[in-house]
Amino acid sequence: MRRNKSLWLFLLTLIVIAVASLFGPAERSLGTNVRLVYIHGAWVWTALIAFGAAAVAGIMGWLLSSQSLHTWSRALGQAGLFFWITYLPLSLWTMQANWNGLYLTEPRFRFAIDFAVIGILLQLAILILKKPRYTSLINMGYFAALWFSLARTEQVMHPPSPILSSNSLEIQFFFFTLLGLCVFALWWLSLWLRQRALERR
């Protein structure tokens, strides 16, 4: 029952996010299409937060020899992959709306696809191995590789941190509110995945 509650709260939070995104402040050059940029940015930041949290939980799991933390690492890694994969269609939608086309050779987009494929393969390996300590190692390695590669991926069409560089406090406030809602959704999804993993032991 508790596991189902977490899933329903996750789905409810997604609905709140969808509704909230409709009320984002317009921007001078992009108009109301900037609302896609808000959700697109908050979504991928949430994925990065999840991968980072999975790595931290993994490190702490190794240091403290904690099975519980290894399980959290697994759940956070899976939740992060959900946000990362679903970010891809959001990215395409944002491209089409704001750039009037799909620039599939954009380095940031190719990077996102590459790490989506790698993430899926690694999560499959985690499910096959069923070794909590290996799960944490994989999540630590994945996050390190992702962060290293992201820092070195060039930007062509993709602007560098458009929200943080904005002069509008209203835009920044709305974005971080939306990000908070996405992280809230991440929490419920991670909790559901953790409970599911514990039940399957």
Task: List each model region and its residues.
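Polytopic transmembrane helical bundles with strong interfacial aromatic enrichment
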Residues: 1-201
